[in-house]
Amino acid sequence: MKKMLAALLMSLAFTTAFAIDIGEAKDQGLVGEARTGYLAAVQQPASAEVKALVAEVNAKRKAQFERTAEKTDTTLLQVANRFWELAVERTAPGHYYQDPSGRWTKK
């Protein structure tokens, strides 16, 4: 079950098509993996482009989290928490993630 959950969650980790994509935004330190399991702007105020990217990615993540929770008989919160754990493990050096206290940390 853990492998299935991990595969489902990571399938949407890097999906979207904007003028700036998620990889570029992470490379530039504009966005990172929030403790909630969703993408968030690291720098405030965020540009309209970054806000749009975050909203699009998070809408897809939420939909996937809901499907995964239903398939695995878990809660949305459990799925989001597990996604965050996996995302932090896979965060590239130089990219940001929130630590358990919510502080932005550069890996």
Predicted regions located by residue number:
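Bacterial N-terminal signal peptides
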Residues: 7-15
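Generic anion/oxyanion-binding catalytic loop in active/binding sites
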Residues: 8, 50, 68
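Short, well-ordered alpha-helical segments
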Residues: 54-69
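Amphipathic, charged alpha-helical segments and their helix-to-coil junctions
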Residues: 20-56, 76-107
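Positively charged n-region of N-terminal signal peptides that target proteins for export
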Residues: 1-4
